[in-house]
Swiss-Prot record:
Compartments reported by the entry: Mitochondrion
GO MF term list: structural constituent of ribosome
Gene that encodes it: mrps-31
Annotated InterPro entries: MRP-S31 (IPR026299)
Complex and partners: Component of the mitochondrial ribosome small subunit (28S) which comprises a 12S rRNA and about 30 distinct proteins.
Keyword annotations from UniProtKB, A to Z: Coiled coil, Mitochondrion, Ribonucleoprotein, Ribosomal protein, Transit peptide
Name of the protein described by the UniProt record: Small ribosomal subunit protein mS31
Species this protein is from: Caenorhabditis elegans
Superkingdom classification of source: Eukaryota
Transit peptide: 1-21
Amino acid sequence: MLRSLCSIAVRLGGARQPRLLSSAASGDGNDGKGAKDAIDEDLLNAIEGVANNIHPQNGSEKKSLKNTLINRLVANEKASFDAAAASASSEMLDDQALIGLLADVAGDAKVEKKLPPKSAQLRQEKRGLVLLRKEIFYQAVQSGFTTEEARVKSETIVNEAQIKLQEQRKALLNDVREKVEQEEVEETERSEKDQKLFTMALEFMEKIYKDDLISSAVRKPVKVDNDAIKLFNQKPLGIWKKGEKYEDFSLGFWKQWDERAARISNGSFGPTNSFEEQIEWTTKGKQWEYPIDNEFKMGDESNVSFIDHVFLERHLPSLGIPKSGPIAHFMHLVCVGLSKNPYMTAAKKREHLKWFADYFNTEKQKLVHKLHEQEQIAAQNAL
């Protein structure tokens, strides 16, 4: 009987959607999780019923049985949460981009390297920001936020951390410290979950950005030579009389590269509204472009005349088709059928005519003519 009642209690608890230990906190700030944090009211009522049925008179035995069942259910819930957290951690560790970024950060901490070019540094910073937003999004979902709230948190928190880091760098350059009281007020106003995510984003941000502005030994200042020739202050030589004919020329590769980087950075979280979603569908060819055109993406067929689709008999003499007889009558029917076909291109229709012309060669024409004469003679004799 105990086994059957325990199975009923477990089924009642499994029928409801389980709450993870990480998202079931009561909000009172205590680190320890009670029984109600992992077990709902229905399951507690089922356990109470099991204890009353087995030990209706003995209060100590009833309490001991309840504690045993609750401890086992909490242990089962904790095991499922640990398994989910382990799979999520393994998925994060399998991310090669994040591993490469952390490896670069660890290498920079151990070995002093030369400062990379400014363009490469900007690309690395953009790449690190995208990865950081993904990590904050994942951590926010694990903390109990919804998907939409996690997306907003990842954007706002990373932006706040970026602004905060820029202010700290400016303060170090100007030897000015920010007010400690203002920081304490901001930290107290921010909730516990937001503060945890903000601290993580700030730590990652400090590793992503290079401290080239702080270290004066990294880049030496360039002294301007005041005695150098100033090219823009010289008189024109007058070699080119008409300068309006000349235009600035630049490689389109760099413009395409910047547009591609912008698309990757902006599209990391997908479209934010239905308008951007429809724009994405239109660029991928999944939706009609406005204004609606029935000849959308016809290609070379848009330049083909209607005459080339309908009047096909004019091609028969050049293909060697006889002007009279059964073959001519058959090819006339072929041309009529092809002229009424709206799904074939004009070139494809001409290929069909050429195939029939190759089929009705000289030998086939003689054979058809002979069979036609024999049929006419047989018809006359039948009369």
